[in-house]
């Protein structure tokens, strides 16, 4: 699964759009990026509301925000207790997909059960197609700010073509959403500025894009990551390396996906807790107490901001306590050591403070 490769393609995609925008005044008509939707929306024009089916609630809530009262959204997968990768749709789910005017999917192999059920006359809007993701890339695209922005725009355009009389309404909702998303990006930028070079590790790469947008550094052992990405259990040596990472305070956060539980993940969470490393639970599907995609991710950013700040405060307090203890011990010694003893201390490595005690 290539996470960094897709990140580079996302940046390239948006750069290409900017370049096209600059060149349009100079050239009459230039080719546009590959559309994210299939079937011509105008061919299915209606008086509304538009019947929309989303494979997962992350994209379903976004479709509802952009569409408002002018769409009727049905979401197939709403529960955090179900793994979308292995989800088996019921006959009624397939029927919903096939009667929809617009089907919203994630793509990149995440919800192929929905993609392969779409009727030829149905307009398909895929997050993966929108940003150029392919099977094998990290499929958790809703955690990417670039993917969210691209999908919001694509949905507004698609709905406007099907229901042109409501285009102003769709555009207005899109602008409202963009304002909220901008606030989220500001919060992520503030975190990145205040907590530079903060590290994290993950039991599963569910939130890779989110952590990347927040400028956190992924220090998850590669051997472990490759094992879980391929669907296997981590080798004992890789698991031990991960535990040592947490025990040595090299990861300031541990991200866990409770929808992908395993004995290895349970052990790593236990190790993190024992070493006072904050554990952040991030599910794939939106929890039932969240109602919008941006709102959910904003709450995750807020939680991580508080957890990191609290951990840094504890670390600082611990460091101060250690320093105070060292000062007290020093005061019991001769306040004026002889030059010879000072020289001996400087040349003797064993007399210096260890990295662990200095932290």
Segments predicted by a language model, with ranges:
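Extracytoplasmic metal-acquisition and chelation regions
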Residues: 2-18, 25-359
């Amino acid at each position: 699964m290539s996470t960094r490769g897709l990140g580079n393609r996302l940046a390239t995609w948006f750069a290409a759009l900017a370049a096209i925008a600059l060149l349009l005044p100079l050239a009459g008509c230039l080719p546009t990026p590959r559309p994210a939707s299939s079937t011509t929306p105008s061919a299915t024009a209606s008086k509304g509301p538009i019947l929309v089916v989303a494979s997962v609630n992350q994209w379903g809530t976004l479709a509802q925000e952009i569409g408002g009262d002018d769409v009727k959204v049905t979401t197939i997968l709403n529960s955090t207790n179900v793994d979308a990768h292995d989800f088996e749709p019921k006959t009624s789910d397939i029927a919903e997909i096939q009667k929809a005017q617009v089907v919203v999917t994630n793509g990149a192999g995440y919800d192929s059960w929905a993609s392969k059920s779409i009727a030829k006359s149905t307009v398909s809007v895929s997050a993966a197609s929108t940003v150029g993701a392919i099977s094998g890339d990290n499929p958790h695209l809703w955690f990417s700010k670039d993917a969210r922005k691209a999908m919001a725009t694509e949905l507004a355009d698609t709905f406007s073509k099907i229901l042109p009389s409501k285009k102003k309404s769709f555009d207005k909702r899109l602008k409202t959403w963009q304002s909220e998303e901008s606030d989220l990006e500001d919060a992520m930028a503030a975190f990145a500025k205040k907590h530079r070079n903060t590290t994290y590790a993950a039991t599963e790469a569910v939130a890779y894009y989110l952590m990347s947008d927040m400028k956190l550094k992924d220090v998850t052992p590669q051997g472990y990551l490759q094992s879980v990405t391929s669907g296997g259990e981590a080798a004992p040596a890789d698991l031990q390396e991960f535990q040592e990472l947490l025990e040595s305070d090299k990861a300031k956060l541990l991200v866990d996906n409770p929808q992908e539980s395993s004995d290895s993940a349970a052990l790593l969470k236990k190790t993190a807790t024992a070493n006072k490393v904050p554990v952040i639970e991030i599910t794939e599907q939106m929890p039932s107490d969240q109602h919008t995609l941006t709102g959910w991710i904003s709450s995750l950013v807020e939680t991580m901001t508080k957890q990191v700040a609290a951990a840094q405060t504890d670390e600082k307090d611990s460091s101060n306590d250690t320093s105070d203890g060292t000062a007290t011990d020093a005061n019991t010694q001769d306040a004026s050591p002889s030059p010879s003893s000072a020289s001996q201390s400087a040349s003797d490595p064993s007399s210096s403070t260890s990295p662990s005690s200095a932290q």
